[in-house]
């Protein structure tokens, strides 16, 4: 009997070691995907801030990978751009060479997006066929792949909003596009964190997990508000801090009717709400840090709480600097990068309260 138990124990240990090797491979893969997604969001931000998003007026999922290669092809691409309101109303004096500078941002954004589809789908297929993906993770990963495909349609849906009447894309569709990118990012982060070893430190308080969830969700909401700010060019509405045009609450926040539409279409109101959201997020991470340091100092949870507070503080400082300098490109991109770092860490922090995925073994499955 003892020999049988020893054999069973050895078999389980062998399976666990094998799963640990597979998990390391999956973490490396998902980490690379996260890095690519981070770059994609930054290039997307640059595309928006340089007003390049409408430079490619057709959706060519396959042969759109190849850019114009001759003067005639550039002339044809430029001719298509000349048909839309953005050129006719804002850029009518633009030359082909000037057009190229905005074309390359949008082309790079689409190319990276296609590349991410490849570096996600092909390894997923390989890991699946070779049995390296645990059963519990198969369909969640397929779900992320499906969200990626949907994101491609959302991207074109966003671009199409600026091709007929508007001179820019809809801020609603822009926000949807960015939030979807963040959800895909969060899904990859959640699974990668679950595949990583966790400490055995107890949670600081009963409310810690709920507070971690609230911080992650609110960070995503702040990103949504930031997308509205970008879509409406609301960063140029008030370029003072901490007051807005000399007041704590400006007088022209509710000038549009019905009043609720101001929260989505009045640039000044949108910036005001984004500021309030930043203060709220700062308060949440401060409360989270104080609770962790008081109830569970020197634990992994406390260290994460301190780091999260530091990240939000730096991000707030970058936001203020970007505002005061009237949104220069590099600072705007730094602010967007900071938002994704804060959100990614908030998701990882939240996932940290659930522990590592239990190992799957044939013994456990039979039991």
UniProtKB/Swiss-Prot annotation:
Q: Name one GO biological process term.
A: heme A biosynthetic process
Can you cite an annotated GO cellular component? plasma membrane
Which cofactors does the annotated protein need, by name?
heme b
- Catalytic activity, reaction form: Fe(II)-heme o + 2 A + H2O = Fe(II)-heme a + 2 AH2
Q: Which UniProt keywords apply?
A: Cell membrane, Heme biosynthesis, Iron, Membrane, Metal-binding, Oxidoreductase, Transmembrane, Transmembrane helix
What is the annotated role of this protein in its UniProt record? Answer: Catalyzes the conversion of heme O to heme A by two successive hydroxylations of the methyl group at C8. The first hydroxylation forms heme I, the second hydroxylation results in an unstable dihydroxymethyl group, which spontaneously dehydrates, resulting in the formyl group of heme A.
Tell me what this protein is called. Answer: Heme A synthase
Q: Which organism is it from?
A: Rhizobium etli (strain ATCC 51251 / DSM 11541 / JCM 21823 / NBRC 15573 / CFN 42)
User: What does the organism's lineage look like at the top?
Assistant: Bacteria, Pseudomonadati, Pseudomonadota, Alphaproteobacteria, Hyphomicrobiales
Q: Which gene encodes it?
A: ctaA
């Amino acid at each position: 009997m003892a020999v049988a138990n020893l054999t069973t124990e050895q078999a389980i240990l062998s399976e666990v070691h094998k799963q640990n090797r597979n998990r390391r491979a999956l973490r490396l893969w998902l980490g690379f995907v996260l890095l690519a997604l981070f770059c994609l969001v930054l290039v997307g931000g640059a595309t928006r801030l340089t007003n390049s998003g409408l430079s490619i007026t057709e959706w060519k999922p396959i042969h759109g990978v190849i850019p114009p290669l001759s003067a005639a092809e550039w002339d044809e691409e430029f001719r298509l751009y000349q048909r839309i309101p953005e050129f006719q109303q804002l850029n009518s004096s633009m030359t082909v060479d000037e057009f190229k500078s905005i074309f390359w941002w949008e082309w790079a954004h689409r190319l990276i997006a296609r590349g991410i589809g490849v570096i996600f789908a092909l390894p997923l297929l390989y890991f699946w066929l070779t049995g390296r993906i645990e059963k519990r993770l198969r369909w969640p990963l397929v779900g992320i792949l499906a969200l990626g495909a949907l994101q491609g349609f959302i991207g074109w849906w966003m671009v199409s909003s600026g091709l007929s009447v508007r001179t820019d894309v809809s801020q609603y569709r822009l926000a949807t596009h960015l939030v979807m990118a963040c959800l895909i990012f969060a899904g990859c982060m959640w699974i990668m964190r679950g595949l990583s070893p966790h400490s055995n430190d107890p949670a600081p308080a009963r409310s810690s997990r709920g507070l971690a969830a609230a911080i992650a969700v609110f960070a995503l909401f702040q990103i949504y508000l930031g997308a509205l700010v970008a879509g409406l060019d609301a960063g140029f509405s008030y370029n003072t801090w901490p007051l807005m045009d000399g007041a704590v609450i400006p007088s022209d926040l509710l000038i549009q009717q019905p009043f609720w539409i101001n929260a989505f279409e009045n640039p000044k109101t949108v910036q005001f709400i984004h500021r309030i959201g930043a203060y709220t997020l700062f308060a949440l991470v401060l409360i989270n840090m104080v609770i962790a340091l008081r109830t569970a100092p020197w634990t992994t949870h406390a260290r994460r709480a301190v780091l999260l507070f530091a990240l939000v503080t730096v991000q707030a400082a970058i936001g203020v600097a970007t505002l005061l300098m009237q949104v220069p490109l590099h600072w705007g991109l730094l602010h967007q990068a900071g938002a994704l770092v804060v959100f990614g860490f908030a998701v990882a922090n939240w996932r940290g309260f659930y522990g590592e995925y239990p190992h799957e073994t044939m013994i456990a499955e039979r039991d």
